[in-house]
Structures are given as structure tokens and as C-alpha cells.
Amino acid sequence: MDCREMDLYEDYQSPFDFDAGVNKSYLYLSPSGNSSPPGSPTLQKFGLLRTDPVPEEGEDVAATISATETLSEEEQEELRRELAKVEEEIQTLSQVLAAKEKHLAEIKRKLGINSLQELKQNIAKGWQDVTATSAYKKTSETLSQAGQKASAAFSSVGSVITKKLEDVKNSPTFKSFEEKVENLKSKVGGTKPAGGDFGEVLNSAANASATTTEPLPEKTQESL
């Protein structure tokens, strides 16, 4: 260390007065989790910010009740009597319910109502409840309208097909073809009054063609 550094070290003065002792106001302990020094303003916890102690598992809930909420001996005794009364009423109602269920089973046995019949009745009642709802009625009406529209569409398609067939039958091409078939029939198998069905004309022409192409019978041995 040279002389210059020695001079700077000697000229340095600490801002703290160590001879005056330690200011105890800066020292504090916080075992409760409070990180603010003594005397500093703290944030009051109200409403949602309030942290109430939560009982641990197995801890008696009564131990967490504050001193202002502690019940007196008379109040505790009254609550115990009320608790015993409620438990007795629950037990009585359970016994009454068991007796009613037994009586109900006996009535069903006498009426011949078995589990299957009861299930059918429940299903029928459930279906009636479903059909009575507005949603089911609306859906049924929608499906009915859709079916009517589909029937009308099929009917219109059939009408269009029938009209197309009639147009084809009345067309000049079809009539010319029908006349040619009739002429062929008249040449092959003779004339037939006009007005016949087109199917009959075709059948007659086919029969006539089969007759003309039938082979001649062979001569018997006697003619020889």
C-alpha cells in the first residue's frame, strides 16, 4: 500500500457512528410472519383479504372458535338436547319408512304386481311423460311436416315421369317406329285392325317371325 492509498484510507469517514452503539429500533423479530418493523403502518385485512385460521385434519373445530363466538354452558346444553331430539326423530322416521315399504310390498304381492309389471308400468308412465312435453310435440310436428313434403315430392316426381312417357309415346319418332312395326306385322302375318296395343303388336310380330322360320317336317317312310 503506497502513501497515496494510506492518505485516502485515513481521510475516509464512515457515515455510521459505531461509538454511539446500535440503534435497537432497526432490530425486530417477526415470529408471527409480520415483515413490517414496529411502528410502521400495516394493511388491515377485511373481507376477502382476511385470513382466518384453517383447522388441520383431525383438529377440533371448536378450538378455532374465537372468544366472542364461544357458547355458554346453557347454550351448549340446549344444543345437545336439540341434537338428541333430531337424532331421535331421524331414527323414528327411518322405522316408519321401513314399515311403509314393507306394507307396500305386501299390497303389491296381493295385487299380483311383480317386478316386470312394475317396470312396464314405469316405462309406460315415462313414455307418457315424454310425449306430453312440448319438445316432443314440436319434434313430432316437424317430422310430420317433413313426411308430407316428402310424399308431395314423390308424387310430383311420379307425375313428371308419367308425363314424360306420354310425351315420348306421342312423339313422331315413336309413332313412326310403331307404324313400321305394324307394317312389318301386316307383311308377315296378315293385317290386324288398327288401334291395337304396342305390346300386342310386338308379340304378334315375334310370333309371325317364329312361324316363318319353323323347319318343314320330314317325310315319313310310308310316303317313300
UniProtKB/Swiss-Prot annotation:
Family the entry assigns: Belongs to the TPD52 family.
Keywords: Coiled coil, Phosphoprotein
Gene: TPD52
GO CC field: cytoplasm; endoplasmic reticulum; perinuclear region of cytoplasm
Comp. bias regions, Low complexity: 203-213
Quaternary structure annotation from Swiss-Prot or TrEMBL: Forms a homodimer or heterodimer with other members of the family. All isoforms interact with several 14-3-3 proteins.
Taxonomic placement: Eukaryota, Metazoa, Chordata, Craniata, Vertebrata
Tissue distribution of the protein: Isoform 2 is expressed in colon, breast, prostate, pancreas and kidney tumor cell lines. Isoform 2 is expressed at high levels in kidney, prostate, brain, small intestine and pancreas, at moderate levels in placenta and colon, at low levels in lung, liver and heart, and at very low levels in spleen, thymus, peripheral mononuclear blood cells, testis and ovary.
Protein name, UniProt field: Tumor protein D52
Superkingdom of the source species: Eukaryota
